[in-house]
Amino acid sequence: MMTSMEGMVEKGVLDDIIRRLLEGKGGKQVQLSESEIRQLCFNARQIFLSQPNLLDLHAPIRICGDIHGQYQDLLRLFEYGGYPPSANYLFLGDYVDRGKQSLETICLLLAYKIRYPSKIYLLRGNHEDAKINRIYGFYDECKRRFNVRLWKVFTDCFNCLPVAALIDEKILCMHGGLSPDLDNLNQIREIQRPIEIPDSGLLCDLLWSDPDQKIEGWADSDRGISCTFGADKVAEFLDKNDLDLICRGHQVVEDGYEFFAKRRLVTIFSAPNYGGEFDNAGALLSVDESLVCSFEIMKPAPASSSHPLKKDFHNRTLGYNLSA
């Protein structure tokens, strides 16, 4: 495979990989070579480590929640929101597991990250963890289509993903949620990578915790790991750190997005008809230059659909202006 002097894949080669992956519309499997995928993982790892663990980003930007190997729905998101580099994107993690095409999903996102490193950003989800994706599908997909060695290459790449992003110093984004160990944003900046996700503590909570409207303060999670937090903890953290909004994924929500804590936290989930078991919509959150948030809602794709359909999207501009 052709690489440049710095060991980075040449743009022409990357463009060809992206072109082939985009030909996978309609459910077609796209089989890159093992060496191509290894190079994507190696180069993406370099870029992740060259950028901060708490990314400093700017609007306008589109924010996407969990994808979980639903590659056709990822293509629908890009069809609607614009393919990179025509728009800026932040993904909140959980690219693999459960869906049928985790490999295509993660390879396209890594290829875009390498090709346009300042236009697309990928955060780590709790499924970008060997302990989890060994069980929920990604390991089996790697083993069936390639080998276990390649799964381990992905593990090394995932251990370098950033864990949070700050948009215009006002919107904090992560996969899971808050932590009783989190007082200020410098604690996120100081997490060293590469790192495995521990079973407890700050990093674990950032990827695993959930809001719970039935409680105040902190409580144990029904997931058996991490914690849940009440609306009071959202307000306390945002006020202390001069922030307006927390944006996170991690939970299936019926409309693709759901507010919590008087609209000071929003959950975004971007895998419609999740796993074929839920009748949920997916959502894409657009934040404009004025920090006005609007949601594009993606209904579950009709079974007969062989290509992305823009008419499946509904725009809900709520005039939610964070800068007001």
From Swiss-Prot:
<dbReference type="GO" id="GO:0005634">
    <property type="term" value="C:nucleus"/>
</dbReference>
<feature type="binding site">
    <location>
        <position position="250"/>
    </location>
    <ligand>
        <name>Mn(2+) 2</name>
    </ligand>
</feature>
<comment type="similarity">
    <text>Belongs to the PPP phosphatase family. PP-1 subfamily.</text>
</comment>
<feature type="binding site">
    <location>
        <position position="66"/>
    </location>
    <ligand>
        <name>Mn(2+) 1</name>
    </ligand>
</feature>
<feature type="binding site">
    <location>
        <position position="68"/>
    </location>
    <ligand>
        <name>Mn(2+) 1</name>
    </ligand>
</feature>
<feature type="active site" description="Proton donor">
    <location>
        <position position="127"/>
    </location>
</feature>
<dbReference type="GO" id="GO:0004722">
    <property type="term" value="F:protein serine/threonine phosphatase activity"/>
</dbReference>
<feature type="binding site">
    <location>
        <position position="94"/>
    </location>
    <ligand>
        <name>Mn(2+) 1</name>
    </ligand>
</feature>
<dbReference type="InterPro" id="IPR006186">
    <property type="entry name" value="Ser/Thr-sp_prot-phosphatase"/>
</dbReference>
<dbReference type="Pfam" id="PF16891">
    <property type="entry name" value="STPPase_N"/>
</dbReference>
<dbReference type="GO" id="GO:0009860">
    <property type="term" value="P:pollen tube growth"/>
</dbReference>
<keyword id="KW-0539">Nucleus</keyword>
<feature type="binding site">
    <location>
        <position position="175"/>
    </location>
    <ligand>
        <name>Mn(2+) 2</name>
    </ligand>
</feature>
<dbReference type="InterPro" id="IPR050341">
    <property type="entry name" value="PP1_catalytic_subunit"/>
</dbReference>
<dbReference type="Pfam" id="PF00149">
    <property type="entry name" value="Metallophos"/>
</dbReference>
<keyword id="KW-0464">Manganese</keyword>
<keyword id="KW-0963">Cytoplasm</keyword>
<dbReference type="InterPro" id="IPR004843">
    <property type="entry name" value="Calcineurin-like_PHP_ApaH"/>
</dbReference>
<dbReference type="GO" id="GO:0046872">
    <property type="term" value="F:metal ion binding"/>
</dbReference>
<keyword id="KW-0378">Hydrolase</keyword>
<dbReference type="GO" id="GO:0005829">
    <property type="term" value="C:cytosol"/>
</dbReference>
<keyword id="KW-0479">Metal-binding</keyword>
<feature type="binding site">
    <location>
        <position position="126"/>
    </location>
    <ligand>
        <name>Mn(2+) 2</name>
    </ligand>
</feature>
<keyword id="KW-0904">Protein phosphatase</keyword>
<feature type="binding site">
    <location>
        <position position="94"/>
    </location>
    <ligand>
        <name>Mn(2+) 2</name>
    </ligand>
</feature>
<comment type="function">
    <text>Serine/threonine-protein phosphatase that possesses phosphatase activity toward para-nitrophenyl phosphate (pNPP) in vitro.</text>
</comment>
<protein>
    <recommendedName>
        <fullName>Serine/threonine-protein phosphatase PP1 isozyme 8</fullName>
        <ecNumber>3.1.3.16</ecNumber>
    </recommendedName>
</protein>
<dbReference type="InterPro" id="IPR031675">
    <property type="entry name" value="STPPase_N"/>
</dbReference>
<dbReference type="GO" id="GO:0048768">
    <property type="term" value="P:root hair cell tip growth"/>
</dbReference>
<dbReference type="InterPro" id="IPR029052">
    <property type="entry name" value="Metallo-depent_PP-like"/>
</dbReference>
